[in-house]
Amino acid sequence: MPQYLETFLAMSKKVLVEYSRYPIAFVALFVQIFLIIVLFVITSFAFETPGTGQAQTTRFAAMMAYGFVTNIILSFTLWEIGFSIREEQVRGTLESLYLSPTNKFSNLLSRVFAILLWTAAISIGGLLLVSGLVGGLPVNNLGKALFVLLMTTTGFLGFGFIFAGITIRLKETAQILVNGVQFFFMIFSAQVFPFSVLPLAVQDYVSRWLPVSYCVDLFRTTLIGEAPELLPNDVLVEYAIVIAFGIVSPIIGYFYYNWIDRKARTEGTLGEY
């Protein structure tokens, strides 16, 4: 078996064993996500225009729910790849791990493998919950939507690699940056509401310049079965942006992480608390 595959399997098993030791935390996270989703749905009902038809209510709920799936993946990727490096530093195991002949790419990927399984379960459960609250969610073009979600996830891996490098440099302070990035994309990439809610200036000068915005837009409008909000007349352009993001982002992120890793080894700061 190739060494990189052995590393990936061993580290994935380690992460799964860690999660299995904290079942209460696992259940608590499920409950937390469900409560957040219910809060968003109820809030959307509160601001609903009187006389709005069921179709419009379902559309808005679908926009929120499908967008929130991308938010969950982004959040878990940042924390599990990015900030979990910090956890290894605190435990005192990062330096010995990275001085061993393990494949660094497999090590980083293993951190997100288990959490993606977890994320999939949470996402499916959350979507079923919203579907029950609003009387069903539209599910169209499932194959295309899953492809877009795959490209979105690989693009987020690049963010995770970058934040893993930043965490080595900033250590505990990186928490603030991770939280800031989460809320930045939640707002400006409209992950929990339609882009039409944002002021036109924000859409033109911020949202349209973020690849994440096109990932969110294309994923949820594909499932809903309507034209994208950002580029309604250029769907192929949105696909090109999403595919480019999914391919280029992890490459850039991994090279950045390797650069920070080598620099930290040279300076002797890799295992510093």
Enumerate the language-model features and the residues they cover.
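Hydrophobic transmembrane alpha-helices and immediately adjacent juxtamembrane helices
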Residues: M1-P138, L142-A164, I168-Y273
